[in-house]
Amino acid sequence: MTEPTQPNAAQPNVVPEVDDNKIIAERREKLRELREQGVAYPNDFRPTHHAEDLQAQYEHSDKEALEANPLEVAIAGRMMLKRVMGKASFATVRDGSGQIQFFITPADVGQETYDAFKKWDMGDIVAARGVLFRTNKGELSVRCTELRLLSKSLRPLPDKFHGLSDQEMKYRQRYVDLIVTPETRKTFVARTKAISSIRKFMADADFMEVETPMLHPIPGGAAAKPFTTHHNALDMQMFLRIAPELYLKRLVVGGFERVFEINRNFRNEGVSVRHNPEFTMIEFYAAYTDYKWLMDFTEQLIRQAAIDALGTATITYQGRELDLAKPFHRLTITQAIQKYAPQYTNEQLADSAFLRTELKKFGVDASQPQFLNAGVGALQLALFEETAESQLWEPTYIIDYPIEVSPLARASDKVEGITERFELFITGREIANGFSELNDPEDQAARFRKQVDQKDAGDEEAMFYDADYIRALEYGMPPAGGCGIGIDRLVMLLTDSPSIRDVILFPHLRRED
Protein backbone atom coordinates (compact mmCIF):
# COMPACT_ATOMS: atom_id res chain seq x y z
CA MET A 1 0.00 0.00 0.00
CA THR A 2 1.22 3.48 -0.81
CA GLU A 3 2.78 5.18 2.21
CA PRO A 4 0.79 8.34 3.00
CA THR A 5 3.45 11.02 2.92
CA GLN A 6 1.96 14.50 2.91
CA PRO A 7 3.56 16.90 0.41
CA ASN A 8 4.67 20.43 1.06
CA ALA A 9 2.46 22.66 -1.07
CA ALA A 10 4.34 25.43 -2.83
CA GLN A 11 2.90 28.90 -2.39
CA PRO A 12 3.63 31.01 -5.47
CA ASN A 13 4.31 34.67 -4.98
CA VAL A 14 2.44 35.63 -8.14
CA VAL A 15 -0.96 34.17 -8.93
CA PRO A 16 -1.62 34.16 -12.69
CA GLU A 17 -4.86 35.67 -13.90
CA VAL A 18 -7.46 33.13 -14.93
CA ASP A 19 -10.47 33.33 -17.21
CA ASP A 20 -13.46 32.55 -15.03
CA ASN A 21 -15.72 32.15 -18.06
CA LYS A 22 -13.43 29.48 -19.47
CA ILE A 23 -13.31 27.67 -16.13
CA ILE A 24 -17.10 27.78 -15.81
CA ALA A 25 -17.47 26.40 -19.34
CA GLU A 26 -15.08 23.54 -18.54
CA ARG A 27 -16.97 22.72 -15.37
CA ARG A 28 -20.31 22.77 -17.15
CA GLU A 29 -18.92 20.21 -19.56
CA LYS A 30 -17.93 18.02 -16.60
CA LEU A 31 -21.45 18.39 -15.23
CA ARG A 32 -22.90 17.38 -18.60
CA GLU A 33 -20.84 14.18 -18.46
CA LEU A 34 -22.12 13.49 -14.94
CA ARG A 35 -25.70 13.96 -16.10
CA GLU A 36 -25.13 11.50 -18.94
CA GLN A 37 -23.80 9.00 -16.40
CA GLY A 38 -26.88 9.58 -14.21
CA VAL A 39 -24.79 10.51 -11.17
CA ALA A 40 -25.28 14.29 -10.99
CA TYR A 41 -26.44 15.66 -7.62
CA PRO A 42 -27.16 12.45 -5.66
CA ASN A 43 -28.85 12.71 -2.25
CA ASP A 44 -28.29 9.37 -0.57
CA PHE A 45 -25.13 9.95 1.49
CA ARG A 46 -25.47 10.43 5.24
CA PRO A 47 -22.41 11.56 7.25
CA THR A 48 -21.74 9.85 10.56
CA HIS A 49 -19.12 12.26 11.89
CA HIS A 50 -18.06 15.91 11.72
CA ALA A 51 -14.51 17.06 11.08
CA GLU A 52 -14.12 19.27 14.14
CA ASP A 53 -15.44 16.58 16.48
CA LEU A 54 -12.89 14.10 15.15
CA GLN A 55 -10.06 16.64 15.38
CA ALA A 56 -10.94 17.35 19.01
CA GLN A 57 -11.60 13.77 20.09
CA TYR A 58 -8.45 12.31 18.53
CA GLU A 59 -6.12 15.27 18.97
CA HIS A 60 -3.80 13.29 21.22
CA SER A 61 -4.13 9.89 19.51
CA ASP A 62 -0.92 8.91 17.74
CA LYS A 63 -0.58 6.79 14.61
CA GLU A 64 -0.21 3.52 16.48
CA ALA A 65 -3.24 4.13 18.70
CA LEU A 66 -5.45 4.84 15.70
CA GLU A 67 -4.23 1.71 13.91
CA ALA A 68 -4.88 -0.39 17.00
CA ASN A 69 -8.48 0.86 17.27
CA PRO A 70 -9.62 1.67 13.72
CA LEU A 71 -12.61 3.99 13.46
CA GLU A 72 -14.81 3.94 10.37
CA VAL A 73 -16.22 7.34 9.45
CA ALA A 74 -18.42 8.92 6.81
CA ILE A 75 -17.78 12.61 6.11
CA ALA A 76 -19.06 15.06 3.52
CA GLY A 77 -18.03 18.62 2.76
CA ARG A 78 -16.54 21.08 0.30
CA MET A 79 -13.17 20.26 -1.25
CA MET A 80 -10.96 23.25 -0.50
CA LEU A 81 -7.64 21.81 -1.68
CA LYS A 82 -6.65 18.91 -3.95
CA ARG A 83 -3.19 17.46 -4.52
CA VAL A 84 -2.83 14.63 -7.03
CA MET A 85 0.47 12.81 -6.49
CA GLY A 86 0.27 9.92 -8.93
CA LYS A 87 -0.43 6.78 -6.90
CA ALA A 88 -1.78 8.74 -3.95
CA SER A 89 -3.70 11.98 -3.60
CA PHE A 90 -4.85 14.30 -0.85
CA ALA A 91 -7.93 16.48 -0.48
CA THR A 92 -8.71 18.98 2.25
CA VAL A 93 -12.45 18.86 2.91
CA ARG A 94 -14.39 21.36 5.01
CA ASP A 95 -17.76 20.56 6.52
CA GLY A 96 -19.95 22.77 8.70
CA SER A 97 -17.72 22.24 11.73
CA GLY A 98 -14.17 22.36 10.42
CA GLN A 99 -11.88 20.55 8.03
CA ILE A 100 -10.09 17.24 7.66
CA GLN A 101 -7.84 15.62 5.09
CA PHE A 102 -8.84 12.77 2.77
CA PHE A 103 -6.14 10.32 1.65
CA ILE A 104 -7.04 8.64 -1.63
CA THR A 105 -5.37 5.81 -3.55
CA PRO A 106 -6.60 3.68 -6.48
CA ALA A 107 -5.96 0.60 -4.36
CA ASP A 108 -8.47 1.80 -1.76
CA VAL A 109 -11.21 3.39 -3.91
CA GLY A 110 -10.69 1.67 -7.27
CA GLN A 111 -9.01 2.97 -10.41
CA GLU A 112 -12.26 4.25 -11.96
CA THR A 113 -13.13 6.37 -8.92
CA TYR A 114 -9.54 7.56 -8.62
CA ASP A 115 -9.50 8.68 -12.26
CA ALA A 116 -12.81 10.47 -11.73
CA PHE A 117 -11.43 12.21 -8.64
CA LYS A 118 -8.61 13.67 -10.72
CA LYS A 119 -11.23 15.60 -12.71
CA TRP A 120 -12.98 17.02 -9.69
CA ASP A 121 -12.48 20.67 -8.83
CA MET A 122 -11.93 22.73 -5.72
CA GLY A 123 -15.32 23.81 -4.45
CA ASP A 124 -17.01 20.51 -5.28
CA ILE A 125 -19.06 18.90 -2.52
CA VAL A 126 -17.56 15.45 -1.93
CA ALA A 127 -18.14 12.57 0.46
CA ALA A 128 -16.07 9.67 1.68
CA ARG A 129 -16.22 6.60 3.86
CA GLY A 130 -13.03 5.30 5.32
CA VAL A 131 -10.86 4.74 8.36
CA LEU A 132 -9.34 7.44 10.52
CA PHE A 133 -5.53 7.45 10.65
CA ARG A 134 -2.58 9.78 11.02
CA THR A 135 -0.09 10.46 8.21
CA ASN A 136 3.68 10.25 8.60
CA LYS A 137 3.64 14.03 9.02
CA GLY A 138 1.13 13.69 11.83
CA GLU A 139 -2.04 15.00 10.17
CA LEU A 140 -5.31 13.35 11.14
CA SER A 141 -6.82 12.02 7.91
CA VAL A 142 -9.43 9.68 6.45
CA ARG A 143 -8.07 6.79 4.39
CA CYS A 144 -10.90 6.67 1.87
CA THR A 145 -12.46 3.36 0.85
CA GLU A 146 -15.41 5.04 -0.87
CA LEU A 147 -15.36 8.43 -2.56
CA ARG A 148 -18.26 10.28 -4.19
CA LEU A 149 -19.06 13.59 -5.82
CA LEU A 150 -22.31 14.97 -4.38
CA SER A 151 -22.53 18.44 -5.94
CA LYS A 152 -20.57 20.00 -8.80
CA SER A 153 -19.25 23.52 -8.25
CA LEU A 154 -19.55 25.45 -11.50
CA ARG A 155 -17.91 28.67 -10.33
CA PRO A 156 -14.28 28.82 -9.15
CA LEU A 157 -13.61 29.94 -5.60
CA PRO A 158 -11.46 33.04 -5.00
CA ASP A 159 -7.73 32.38 -4.93
CA LYS A 160 -6.89 30.68 -1.64
CA PHE A 161 -3.92 32.93 -0.95
CA HIS A 162 -5.81 36.19 -1.43
CA GLY A 163 -9.35 35.25 -0.49
CA LEU A 164 -12.31 37.53 -1.16
CA SER A 165 -10.59 40.92 -1.03
CA ASP A 166 -13.41 43.11 -2.39
CA GLN A 167 -15.27 44.26 0.72
CA GLU A 168 -18.56 44.93 -1.07
CA MET A 169 -18.35 41.53 -2.76
CA LYS A 170 -17.96 39.95 0.68
CA TYR A 171 -21.30 41.46 1.68
CA ARG A 172 -23.06 40.90 -1.64
CA GLN A 173 -21.93 37.29 -2.04
CA ARG A 174 -21.86 36.28 1.61
CA TYR A 175 -22.12 32.63 0.60
CA VAL A 176 -18.67 32.86 -1.00
CA ASP A 177 -17.29 34.81 1.94
CA LEU A 178 -18.45 32.07 4.30
CA ILE A 179 -16.79 29.42 2.14
CA VAL A 180 -13.37 31.04 1.95
CA THR A 181 -13.08 33.15 5.12
CA PRO A 182 -12.88 31.25 8.43
CA GLU A 183 -13.08 34.52 10.41
CA THR A 184 -16.46 35.30 8.88
CA ARG A 185 -17.83 31.92 9.92
CA LYS A 186 -16.49 32.46 13.44
CA THR A 187 -18.24 35.83 13.62
CA PHE A 188 -21.65 34.37 12.87
CA VAL A 189 -21.13 31.38 15.14
CA ALA A 190 -20.36 33.86 17.93
CA ARG A 191 -23.49 35.83 17.01
CA THR A 192 -25.65 32.73 17.35
CA LYS A 193 -24.03 31.86 20.68
CA ALA A 194 -24.63 35.38 21.98
CA ILE A 195 -28.31 35.34 21.02
CA SER A 196 -28.75 31.87 22.53
CA SER A 197 -27.12 33.15 25.71
CA ILE A 198 -29.48 36.13 25.84
CA ARG A 199 -32.53 33.91 25.39
CA LYS A 200 -31.40 31.62 28.21
CA PHE A 201 -30.60 34.59 30.43
CA MET A 202 -34.09 35.97 29.90
CA ALA A 203 -35.76 32.61 30.48
CA ASP A 204 -33.79 32.10 33.69
CA ALA A 205 -35.08 35.50 34.87
CA ASP A 206 -38.70 34.39 34.23
CA PHE A 207 -39.23 36.46 31.09
CA MET A 208 -41.66 35.18 28.46
CA GLU A 209 -40.66 35.48 24.80
CA VAL A 210 -43.41 36.92 22.62
CA GLU A 211 -43.97 38.06 19.05
CA THR A 212 -45.58 41.36 18.16
CA PRO A 213 -46.60 42.80 14.77
CA MET A 214 -44.13 43.81 12.09
CA LEU A 215 -46.77 45.83 10.24
CA HIS A 216 -48.06 48.77 12.26
CA PRO A 217 -50.99 51.07 11.48
CA ILE A 218 -49.12 53.81 13.37
CA PRO A 219 -45.32 53.87 13.74
CA GLY A 220 -44.21 54.26 17.33
CA GLY A 221 -41.85 53.27 20.09
CA ALA A 222 -38.86 55.26 18.83
CA ALA A 223 -37.90 58.50 17.15
CA ALA A 224 -37.19 57.36 13.60
CA LYS A 225 -38.41 57.61 10.01
CA PRO A 226 -40.42 54.50 9.03
CA PHE A 227 -40.76 52.50 5.84
CA THR A 228 -44.28 52.68 4.45
CA THR A 229 -46.30 50.07 2.58
CA HIS A 230 -49.90 49.46 1.56
CA HIS A 231 -52.27 46.71 2.68
CA ASN A 232 -54.35 45.97 -0.41
CA ALA A 233 -57.15 43.98 1.24
CA LEU A 234 -57.75 46.61 3.92
CA ASP A 235 -56.85 49.50 1.61
CA MET A 236 -54.75 51.19 4.27
CA GLN A 237 -51.27 52.56 4.65
CA MET A 238 -49.07 50.60 7.04
CA PHE A 239 -45.57 50.95 8.39
CA LEU A 240 -42.77 48.47 8.99
CA ARG A 241 -42.14 48.66 12.68
CA ILE A 242 -39.43 50.92 14.01
CA ALA A 243 -39.73 49.38 17.50
CA PRO A 244 -42.00 46.87 19.29
CA GLU A 245 -42.19 48.95 22.47
CA LEU A 246 -45.83 50.01 22.53
CA TYR A 247 -47.08 46.50 21.77
CA LEU A 248 -44.88 44.94 24.44
CA LYS A 249 -46.17 47.42 27.01
CA ARG A 250 -49.74 46.56 26.01
CA LEU A 251 -48.85 43.01 27.09
CA VAL A 252 -47.67 44.32 30.46
CA VAL A 253 -51.07 46.01 30.79
CA GLY A 254 -52.63 42.64 29.96
CA GLY A 255 -50.89 40.94 32.85
CA PHE A 256 -47.70 39.48 31.36
CA GLU A 257 -45.32 40.99 33.89
CA ARG A 258 -42.04 40.06 32.17
CA VAL A 259 -41.88 39.91 28.37
CA PHE A 260 -39.17 40.15 25.74
CA GLU A 261 -38.84 39.97 21.98
CA ILE A 262 -35.80 39.41 19.75
CA ASN A 263 -36.67 40.51 16.26
CA ARG A 264 -36.12 42.93 13.41
CA ASN A 265 -36.77 46.65 13.37
CA PHE A 266 -36.81 48.81 10.24
CA ARG A 267 -35.80 52.45 9.95
CA ASN A 268 -35.76 54.36 6.69
CA GLU A 269 -32.58 56.26 7.44
CA GLY A 270 -28.94 56.44 6.41
CA VAL A 271 -26.53 53.55 6.07
CA SER A 272 -23.20 53.65 7.91
CA VAL A 273 -20.78 51.42 9.80
CA ARG A 274 -23.25 51.63 12.72
CA HIS A 275 -26.58 51.67 10.87
CA ASN A 276 -28.43 49.21 8.66
CA PRO A 277 -32.05 49.90 7.67
CA GLU A 278 -33.00 46.42 8.92
CA PHE A 279 -31.50 45.42 12.25
CA THR A 280 -32.05 43.10 15.20
CA MET A 281 -32.89 44.16 18.74
CA ILE A 282 -34.01 42.65 21.98
CA GLU A 283 -36.59 44.66 23.90
CA PHE A 284 -37.73 43.57 27.34
CA TYR A 285 -40.13 44.89 29.96
CA ALA A 286 -40.45 43.98 33.62
CA ALA A 287 -43.24 45.10 35.92
CA TYR A 288 -42.32 46.50 39.34
CA THR A 289 -38.80 47.49 38.30
CA ASP A 290 -37.16 50.80 37.43
CA TYR A 291 -34.24 52.10 35.40
CA LYS A 292 -31.71 51.33 38.15
CA TRP A 293 -32.77 47.68 38.19
CA LEU A 294 -32.57 47.67 34.39
CA MET A 295 -28.98 48.94 34.40
CA ASP A 296 -27.87 46.16 36.74
CA PHE A 297 -29.78 43.55 34.73
CA THR A 298 -28.49 44.77 31.35
CA GLU A 299 -24.92 44.78 32.62
CA GLN A 300 -25.24 41.16 33.75
CA LEU A 301 -26.88 40.15 30.46
CA ILE A 302 -24.10 41.62 28.31
CA ARG A 303 -21.40 40.15 30.52
CA GLN A 304 -22.95 36.67 30.29
CA ALA A 305 -23.40 36.94 26.52
CA ALA A 306 -19.67 37.65 26.17
CA ILE A 307 -18.75 34.69 28.36
CA ASP A 308 -21.06 32.31 26.50
CA ALA A 309 -20.02 33.51 23.04
CA LEU A 310 -16.28 33.91 23.63
CA GLY A 311 -15.48 32.10 26.86
CA THR A 312 -14.38 35.31 28.56
CA ALA A 313 -15.67 38.72 29.62
CA THR A 314 -12.35 40.33 28.64
CA ILE A 315 -12.39 41.24 24.98
CA THR A 316 -10.32 43.22 22.49
CA TYR A 317 -11.96 45.72 20.18
CA GLN A 318 -9.93 47.43 17.46
CA GLY A 319 -6.70 46.85 19.35
CA ARG A 320 -7.94 48.01 22.76
CA GLU A 321 -8.85 45.76 25.65
CA LEU A 322 -12.23 45.92 27.37
CA ASP A 323 -13.09 44.19 30.62
CA LEU A 324 -16.84 43.62 30.71
CA ALA A 325 -16.49 41.99 34.13
CA LYS A 326 -15.82 45.37 35.74
CA PRO A 327 -18.77 47.48 36.93
CA PHE A 328 -20.06 49.80 34.22
CA HIS A 329 -19.58 53.55 34.75
CA ARG A 330 -22.53 55.91 35.29
CA LEU A 331 -22.55 59.60 34.36
CA THR A 332 -25.17 62.26 33.77
CA ILE A 333 -25.14 64.09 30.44
CA THR A 334 -23.50 67.19 31.93
CA GLN A 335 -20.97 65.11 33.89
CA ALA A 336 -19.95 63.39 30.66
CA ILE A 337 -19.60 66.70 28.83
CA GLN A 338 -17.41 68.16 31.57
CA LYS A 339 -15.32 65.01 31.81
CA TYR A 340 -14.34 65.10 28.14
CA ALA A 341 -14.70 68.86 27.55
CA PRO A 342 -13.79 70.38 30.94
CA GLN A 343 -13.78 73.92 29.57
CA TYR A 344 -17.56 74.12 29.96
CA THR A 345 -18.88 75.51 33.25
CA ASN A 346 -22.17 74.68 34.92
CA GLU A 347 -23.43 78.16 34.08
CA GLN A 348 -22.60 77.77 30.41
CA LEU A 349 -24.30 74.37 30.22
CA ALA A 350 -27.46 75.91 31.68
CA ASP A 351 -27.53 78.74 29.11
CA SER A 352 -29.62 77.97 26.00
CA ALA A 353 -28.15 80.84 23.98
CA PHE A 354 -24.60 79.72 24.79
CA LEU A 355 -25.40 76.12 23.88
CA ARG A 356 -26.90 77.13 20.52
CA THR A 357 -23.82 79.21 19.73
CA GLU A 358 -21.51 76.40 20.76
CA LEU A 359 -23.37 73.83 18.68
CA LYS A 360 -22.88 75.97 15.59
CA LYS A 361 -19.12 75.59 16.08
CA PHE A 362 -19.60 71.84 15.67
CA GLY A 363 -21.65 72.32 12.51
CA VAL A 364 -24.99 71.56 14.18
CA ASP A 365 -27.81 73.54 12.60
CA ALA A 366 -29.91 74.70 15.54
CA SER A 367 -32.64 75.82 13.14
CA GLN A 368 -33.56 72.22 12.35
CA PRO A 369 -37.14 71.28 13.32
CA GLN A 370 -36.08 69.23 16.35
CA PHE A 371 -34.23 72.27 17.76
CA LEU A 372 -36.79 75.00 17.08
CA ASN A 373 -38.35 74.84 20.52
CA ALA A 374 -35.58 72.89 22.20
CA GLY A 375 -34.91 73.56 25.84
CA VAL A 376 -31.64 73.37 27.71
CA GLY A 377 -31.86 69.60 28.12
CA ALA A 378 -32.15 68.85 24.41
CA LEU A 379 -29.32 71.27 23.63
CA GLN A 380 -27.13 69.68 26.30
CA LEU A 381 -27.79 66.29 24.72
CA ALA A 382 -26.76 67.63 21.31
CA LEU A 383 -23.53 69.01 22.80
CA PHE A 384 -22.90 65.68 24.55
CA GLU A 385 -23.16 63.91 21.20
CA GLU A 386 -20.52 66.23 19.76
CA THR A 387 -18.06 66.30 22.67
CA ALA A 388 -18.36 63.14 24.74
CA GLU A 389 -20.23 60.31 23.05
CA SER A 390 -17.36 59.04 20.91
CA GLN A 391 -15.04 59.14 23.96
CA LEU A 392 -17.07 56.62 25.97
CA TRP A 393 -14.85 53.62 25.31
CA GLU A 394 -15.36 51.87 28.63
CA PRO A 395 -18.94 50.66 29.26
CA THR A 396 -20.78 53.75 30.50
CA TYR A 397 -24.40 54.46 31.34
CA ILE A 398 -25.42 58.02 30.53
CA ILE A 399 -28.38 58.76 32.80
CA ASP A 400 -31.07 61.37 33.48
CA TYR A 401 -32.12 62.28 29.94
CA PRO A 402 -34.25 65.41 29.41
CA ILE A 403 -37.99 64.86 29.25
CA GLU A 404 -38.35 66.62 25.90
CA VAL A 405 -36.33 63.90 24.11
CA SER A 406 -37.81 61.03 26.14
CA PRO A 407 -41.55 60.98 25.35
CA LEU A 408 -42.12 57.45 26.68
CA ALA A 409 -40.00 57.62 29.85
CA ARG A 410 -41.17 58.30 33.40
CA ALA A 411 -40.33 61.74 34.74
CA SER A 412 -37.98 61.97 37.70
CA ASP A 413 -39.58 62.56 41.09
CA LYS A 414 -36.46 64.40 42.25
CA VAL A 415 -35.32 66.66 39.42
CA GLU A 416 -37.70 68.62 37.25
CA GLY A 417 -37.28 68.29 33.50
CA ILE A 418 -35.43 64.96 33.40
CA THR A 419 -36.51 61.34 33.17
CA GLU A 420 -35.44 58.04 34.68
CA ARG A 421 -33.70 57.05 31.47
CA PHE A 422 -30.29 55.75 30.46
CA GLU A 423 -28.34 54.91 27.36
CA LEU A 424 -25.40 52.50 27.46
CA PHE A 425 -22.31 53.35 25.42
CA ILE A 426 -19.37 51.05 24.75
CA THR A 427 -16.49 51.94 22.38
CA GLY A 428 -18.25 55.22 21.68
CA ARG A 429 -21.40 53.55 20.37
CA GLU A 430 -24.87 53.32 21.81
CA ILE A 431 -25.60 49.71 22.72
CA ALA A 432 -28.76 49.99 24.81
CA ASN A 433 -31.54 52.40 25.74
CA GLY A 434 -33.82 51.94 28.74
CA PHE A 435 -36.00 53.71 31.25
CA SER A 436 -38.61 53.51 33.92
CA GLU A 437 -41.81 53.40 31.90
CA LEU A 438 -44.31 56.23 31.77
CA ASN A 439 -47.60 54.64 32.89
CA ASP A 440 -49.64 57.81 33.48
CA PRO A 441 -52.08 57.93 30.51
CA GLU A 442 -52.75 61.66 30.80
CA ASP A 443 -49.07 62.54 30.91
CA GLN A 444 -48.43 60.19 27.97
CA ALA A 445 -51.25 61.76 25.95
CA ALA A 446 -49.82 65.23 26.57
CA ARG A 447 -46.37 64.12 25.45
CA PHE A 448 -47.80 62.53 22.31
CA ARG A 449 -49.50 65.83 21.50
CA LYS A 450 -46.15 67.62 21.79
CA GLN A 451 -44.65 65.04 19.44
CA VAL A 452 -47.42 65.73 16.93
CA ASP A 453 -46.63 69.44 17.14
CA GLN A 454 -42.97 68.66 16.40
CA LYS A 455 -43.98 66.50 13.44
CA ASP A 456 -46.20 69.28 12.11
CA ALA A 457 -43.18 71.60 12.40
CA GLY A 458 -41.18 69.31 10.12
CA ASP A 459 -39.52 66.78 12.44
CA GLU A 460 -39.91 63.53 10.47
CA GLU A 461 -38.71 61.44 13.42
CA ALA A 462 -41.26 62.75 15.91
CA MET A 463 -43.85 60.23 17.10
CA PHE A 464 -47.49 59.86 16.08
CA TYR A 465 -50.37 60.04 18.55
CA ASP A 466 -51.32 56.43 19.36
CA ALA A 467 -54.86 56.56 20.74
CA ASP A 468 -55.11 52.80 21.28
CA TYR A 469 -51.95 52.81 23.38
CA ILE A 470 -53.41 55.59 25.52
CA ARG A 471 -56.57 53.51 25.90
CA ALA A 472 -54.46 50.57 27.07
CA LEU A 473 -52.73 52.74 29.68
CA GLU A 474 -56.14 53.91 30.89
CA TYR A 475 -56.85 50.35 32.01
CA GLY A 476 -53.80 50.66 34.27
CA MET A 477 -50.22 49.57 33.66
CA PRO A 478 -48.11 48.56 36.66
CA PRO A 479 -44.90 50.50 37.28
CA ALA A 480 -42.29 48.95 35.03
CA GLY A 481 -38.91 49.26 33.40
CA GLY A 482 -38.02 48.52 29.78
CA CYS A 483 -34.86 48.32 27.73
CA GLY A 484 -33.75 47.76 24.14
CA ILE A 485 -30.34 46.36 23.19
CA GLY A 486 -28.97 46.44 19.65
CA ILE A 487 -27.96 42.85 18.92
CA ASP A 488 -25.92 43.79 15.86
CA ARG A 489 -23.86 46.40 17.70
CA LEU A 490 -23.34 44.03 20.60
CA VAL A 491 -22.05 41.36 18.21
CA MET A 492 -19.78 43.95 16.57
CA LEU A 493 -18.26 44.50 19.99
CA LEU A 494 -17.89 40.81 20.82
CA THR A 495 -16.37 39.87 17.45
CA ASP A 496 -14.09 42.89 16.97
CA SER A 497 -16.00 43.88 13.82
CA PRO A 498 -15.59 47.50 12.67
CA SER A 499 -18.80 47.63 10.60
CA ILE A 500 -22.36 46.53 11.26
CA ARG A 501 -22.28 44.90 7.82
CA ASP A 502 -19.69 42.47 9.15
CA VAL A 503 -22.22 40.98 11.59
CA ILE A 504 -25.32 40.91 9.37
CA LEU A 505 -25.36 37.96 7.01
CA PHE A 506 -26.94 39.85 4.14
CA PRO A 507 -26.65 43.62 4.73
CA HIS A 508 -28.43 46.08 2.48
CA LEU A 509 -26.48 47.26 -0.56
CA ARG A 510 -27.26 49.20 -3.70
CA ARG A 511 -28.75 47.06 -6.43
CA GLU A 512 -26.25 45.56 -8.86
CA ASP A 513 -26.31 47.04 -12.38
UniProtKB/Swiss-Prot annotation:
Binding site for Mg(2+) 2: E430
Keyword match Cytoplasm: yes
Cofactor: Mg(2+)
Compositional bias ranges of the Polar residues kind: 1-11
Reactions listed under catalytic activity: tRNA(Lys) + L-lysine + ATP = L-lysyl-tRNA(Lys) + AMP + diphosphate
InterPro entries: Aa-tRNA-synt_II, aa-tRNA-synth_II, aa-tRNA-synth_II/BPL/LPL, Lys-tRNA-ligase_II, Lys-tRNA-ligase_II_N, Lys-tRNA-synth_II_C, NA-bd_OB-fold, NA-bd_OB_tRNA
Binding sites annotated in the UniProt record for Mg(2+) 1: E423, E430
SUPFAM superfamilies to which the protein is assigned, alphabetical: Class II aaRS and biotin synthetases, Nucleic acid-binding proteins
Keyword annotations of the record: Aminoacyl-tRNA synthetase, ATP-binding, Cytoplasm, Ligase, Magnesium, Metal-binding, Nucleotide-binding, Protein biosynthesis
Molecular function terms, GO-annotated: ATP binding; lysine-tRNA ligase activity; magnesium ion binding; tRNA binding
Region (Disordered): 1-22
GO CC term, one of those recorded: cytosol
Protein location: Cytoplasm
Name this protein carries in UniProt: Lysine--tRNA ligase
Species assigned in the record: Paraburkholderia xenovorans (strain LB400)
